[in-house]
Swiss-Prot record:
This is Vacuolar fusion protein CCZ1 homolog. Belongs to the CCZ1 family. It comes from Bos taurus. InterPro entries: Ccz1, CCZ1/INTU/HSP4_longin_1, CCZ1/INTU/HSP4_longin_3, CCZ1/INTU_longin_2. Keywords: Acetylation, Guanine-nucleotide releasing factor, Lysosome, Membrane, Phosphoprotein.
């Protein structure tokens, strides 16, 4: 349990804050143990595993009862969450009769009473349902990306195989959940796109076409620069979850000092090879080692339709990364990897350098303004484009936001209001800290702005937001 001292004044040292924490996470299917004495068969995965068997059965039984009870009132949409003083339970049925449940402990403030005994206060209203329901859905999407559906595991090897896959995946994945840093971006699950001029975009398009022609077994390609997406041949929903995996898991594991020029040591091991910075992030570590293993992660896409299994090859040069996806029935050889390296490496290095140069020119032209008076989050539901100046960096372990958590909660509350109505609308809130928070929903797009202008009035705030829309989103139509 991590605690942080907070507060001001005399009692500050006595007050401790504990962020939300994962208490339990389980997956069950009520059809697998319908008779008395067979209840344990329903449980497919349970964390923490040390929990005594009868308690597991009791907790799953309680969830079943809650779902059944809420079905009475809403047959098509049963329980999504249950609020109690100490925790919040979230329910998700991603496939028929397969239920996932996540129990999160509410944040705690521990104070010292007059007689010196600790008094625990649960912050019942701090957690946002939509944020943690989205986190639970992400858990399933990430499992499905690397393992396929629950049903497919049942078809391939019955309950035994499904349990093995769930254990193997979630045992590791749950350790990467950092519930204290989840926020509005988890609801959107969007993709940050890299801003590019037409000429450079065409160069990238032409590079992808050349690569797909040279490496004919490549089925899909995705191109990223600086952890932002430029091009993808995958369906949106598949790219969205692959993007999350790349930016929060794979890339952070391979962080390298950005190459500032061409003065770093250049790889030129292979005779006649053009000098380049390319390397595999998945697959063989050393292409010169004849024993090198060419194992690539397997991913599953289009699971509702054609159900494709693919090998994921991620290759990087400087800040540019390309994902090549090939049919899983084809096993890439070391020769193929060497060929890919010799074709892609030099061209990707030059391209990465071009993008960097172009980006710096554009940056200089737009001029580095002083710290603006506002921060914003933008999301487009149609193409999943997301942009945030609120987040300095979103890493797997921490979401570094440059604003107070109270303001992040207001953003979440505004988003919940937007969900309840279909019409376009605007909400303006003045926070206790004198910040102004504005939410705009217009034509499948959402914009959230935080303004640091204590003495501004409503009209002035409205004008500021209009100015922001004109400068940052000049080609996007926002209804007034």
């Amino acid at each position: 349990m991590a605690a942080a001292a907070s507060g001001a004044g005399a009692g500050a040292a006595q007050e401790k804050q504990f962020p939300p924490a994962l208490l339990s996470f389980f997956i069950y299917n009520p059809r697998f143990g319908p008779r008395e004495g067979e209840e344990e068969n329903k449980i497919l995965f349970y964390y923490p595993n040390e929990v005594e068997k009868n308690e597991k059965i009791r907790n799953v039984g309680l969830c079943e009862a809650i779902v059944q009870f809420t079905r009475t009132f809403s047959p098509s949409k049963p329980a999504k969450s249950l609020h109690t003083q100490k925790n919040r339970q979230f329910f998700n049925e991603p496939e028929e009769n397969f239920w996932m449940v996540m129990v999160v402990r509410n944040p705690i403030i521990e104070k010292q009473s007059k007689d010196g005994k600790p008094v625990v206060e649960y912050q019942e209203e701090e957690l946002l349902d939509k944020v943690y329901s989205s986190v639970l859905q992400q858990c399933y999407s990430m499992y499905k990306l690397f393992n396929g559906t629950f049903l497919r595991a049942m078809e391939d090897g019955g309950v035994k195989l499904l349990k093995e896959r769930l254990e193997k995946f979630f045992h590791r994945y749950l350790q990467t959940l950092h519930l204290q840093s989840c926020d509005l971006l988890d609801i959107f699950g969007g993709i940050s796109f890299f801003p590019l001029d037409k000429m450079t975009y065409l160069k990238i398009q032409s590079f992808i076409n050349r690569m797909e022609e040279s490496l004919s077994i490549v089925k899909y390609t995705a191109f990223l620069y600086n952890d932002q997406l430029i091009w993808s041949g995958l369906e949106q929903d598949d790219m969205r979850i692959l993007y999350k995996y790349l930016t929060t898991s794979l890339f952070p594991r391979h962080i390298e000092p950005e190459l500032a020029g061409r003065d770093s040591p250049i790889r030129a091991e292979m005779p006649g090879n053009l000098q380049h910075y390319g390397r595999f992030l998945t697959g063989p570590l050393n292409l010169n080692d004849p024993e090198a293993k060419c194992r690539f992660p397997k991913i599953f896409v289009n699971t509702d339709d054609t159900y494709e299994a693919l090998h994921l090859i991620v290759y990087k040069a400087m800040s540019a990364a390309v994902c090549f996806m090939i049919d899983a029935s084809i096993q890439p050889t070391l020769d193929f990897c060497r060929r890919l390296d010799s074709i892609v490496g030099p061209q990707l290095t030059v391209l990465a350098s071009d993008i960097c140069e172009q980006f710096n020119i554009n940056k200089r032209m737009s001029g580095s303004e002083k710290e603006p008076q506002f921060k914003f989050i933008y999301f487009n539901h149609m193409n999943l484009a997301e942009k945030s100046t609120v987040h300095m960096r979103k890493t797997p372990s921490v979401s570094l936001t440059s604003v107070h958590p109270d303001l992040m909660k207001i953003l979440g509350d505004i988003n919940s209001d937007f969900t309840r109505v279909d019409e376009d609308e605007e909400i303006i809130v003045k926070a206790m800290s004198d910040y102004w928070v504005v939410g705009k929903k217009s034509d499948q797009r959402e914009l959230y702005v935080i303004l640091n202008q204590k003495n501004a009035n409503l009209i002035e705030v409205n004008e500021e937001v209009k100015k922001l829309c004109a400068t940052q989103f000049n080609n996007i139509f926002f209804l007034d």
